[in-house]
């Protein structure tokens, strides 16, 4: 109800008194009425009966208010917010990713151990087990209750499964992005130009034109500082990894033209996996690398590969090709008043011409029709002293039409 109308209503106490008086004056039921009507009349006589309209109005008043206005609800189940929460509730399981959550807080190699432990416990865990009170009593030998051990194992299995699902989604998203970018022709052209540019910059790092072009290219990558810094220092040792990545992507996308789209996506994934393993072993100086660190390095190279392909797409659209597109008349810009008056002035100035010229004046390019000079007509064979050659068949107006290949000689005084 509108707040203004709500203010015009009588106070609740006065409304209750009016409704009680109306209830007391209610007519007695007929003897032929059903038992339900008789019981309702008896309840009204005792003062416990509440008419349906009054109950509906009471619930309506409760739903209109907020906060304390809802304290008069008959039961918690009738509370609007409780009903909304019950209708929208869902089983909440907190998201976990053993590879990426709580960065810098886990002990070294603990993520790897949790991941492998969850994978091993997944087959022997009883998912239908119901914990009872005796399960929470600690064991005399280990000091750990069976319930605590079961909950810990269930947490490890849940974390393992959620980690696997999130990594699967990350890999699918990467494949879809790579497939979409590699399928574009602009990406291949832009990657070819980018590779050619970085190769020239590597051979001549002190070239000022190349450095100026490098700053222009960097303007397309503003959202990732690591990629931006590596691109600015691509000729330095700390940017060598980006140069290797561009070379690998160029060899797959540009050089191998016979590969299908799926093969190119697979080759890029294999390259990211190989680069991740190589640099992970180079960091840890050992063939054994924790799986979480290896996955993080692979994810870094995947993001950088997407940055290179996106940058190639931005560079590939800068092609000096003239685009021929038919634009409908309705999409052209209309003439301004000044342009319209100028066209009208030219139209009025050419009113004395022939009828055909007047009819075709507003055709495309009709007002820009070129008429040859007198000397050009004489040189074409009209004879000396004749200003206008005999009209050709179908030429009205006394001016002979010539092709664009005809020679043009300026008159005396023309330049």
UniProtKB/Swiss-Prot annotation:
Additional facts recorded: All late proteins expressed from the major late promoter are produced by alternative splicing and alternative polyadenylation of the same gene giving rise to non-overlapping ORFs. A leader sequence is present in the N-terminus of all these mRNAs and is recognized by the viral shutoff protein to provide expression although conventional translation via ribosome scanning from the cap has been shut off in the host cell.
Keyword annotations: Host nucleus, Late protein, Phosphoprotein, Viral genome packaging, Viral release from host cell
Induction entry: Expressed in the early phase and late phase of the viral replicative cycle.
Protein name: Packaging protein 3
Presence of the UniProt keyword Phosphoprotein in the record: yes
Biased composition (Low complexity): 31-46, 381-394
Its job: Involved in viral genome packaging through its interaction with packaging proteins 1 and 2. After proteolytic cleavage by adenovirus protease, L1 52/55k protein is removed from the capsid during viral maturation.
UniProt GO cellular component terms: host cell nucleus
UniProt-annotated stretches for the region Interaction with packaging protein 1: 1-173
Organism of derivation: Human adenovirus C serotype 2
Ranges of Basic and acidic residues composition bias in the record: 76-85
Site entry (Cleavage), positions: 351-352
């Amino acid at each position: 109800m509108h707040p203004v109308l709500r203010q015009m209503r009588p106070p609740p106490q006065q409304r209750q008194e009016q409704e009680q008086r109306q209830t007391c004056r209610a007519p007695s039921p007929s003897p032929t009425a059903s038992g339900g009507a008789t019981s309702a009349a008896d309840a009204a006589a005792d003062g416990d009966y509440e008419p349906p309209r009054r109950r509906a109005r009471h619930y309506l008043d409760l739903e209109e208010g907020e906060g304390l206005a809802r304290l008069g609800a008959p039961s918690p189940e009738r509370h609007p917010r409780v009903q909304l929460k019950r209708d929208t509730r869902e089983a909440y399981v907190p998201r976990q990713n053993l590879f990426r959550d709580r960065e810098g807080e886990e002990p070294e190699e603990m993520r790897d151990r949790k991941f492998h432990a969850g994978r091993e416990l997944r087959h022997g865990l009883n998912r239908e087990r119901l914990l009872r009170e005796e399960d929470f009593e600690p064991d005399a030998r280990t000091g750990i209750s069976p319930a605590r051990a079961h909950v810990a194992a269930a947490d490890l299995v849940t974390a393992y499964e959620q980690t696997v699902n999130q990594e699967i989604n990350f890999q699918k998203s990467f494949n879809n992005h790579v497939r979409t970018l590699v399928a574009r022709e602009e990406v291949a052209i832009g990657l070819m130009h980018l590779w050619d540019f970085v190769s020239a910059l590597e051979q001549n790092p002190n070239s000022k034109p190349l450095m100026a072009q490098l700053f222009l290219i960097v303007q397309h990558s503003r959202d990732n500082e690591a990629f931006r810094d590596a691109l600015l220092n691509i000729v330095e040792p700390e940017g060598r990894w980006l140069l290797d990545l561009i070379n690998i992507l160029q060899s797959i996308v540009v050089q191998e033209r016979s590969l299908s789209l799926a093969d190119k996506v697979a080759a890029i994934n294999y390259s990211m996996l190989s680069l991740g393993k190589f640099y992970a072993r180079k960091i840890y100086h050992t063939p054994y690398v924790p799986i979480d660190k290896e996955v993080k390095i692979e994810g870094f190279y995947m993001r950088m590969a997407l940055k290179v392909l996106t940058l190639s797409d931005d560079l590939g659209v800068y092609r000096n090709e003239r685009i021929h597109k038919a634009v409908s008349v309705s999409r052209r810009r209309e003439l301004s008043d000044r342009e319209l008056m100028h066209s009208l002035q030219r139209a009025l100035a050419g009113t004395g011409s022939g009828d055909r010229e007047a009819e075709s004046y507003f055709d495309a390019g009709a007002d820009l029709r070129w008429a040859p000079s007198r000397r050009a007509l004489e040189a074409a064979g009209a004879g000396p002293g004749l200003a206008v050659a005999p009209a050709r068949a179908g030429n009205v107006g006394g001016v002979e039409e010539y092709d664009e290949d005809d020679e043009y000689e300026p008159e005396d005084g023309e330049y």
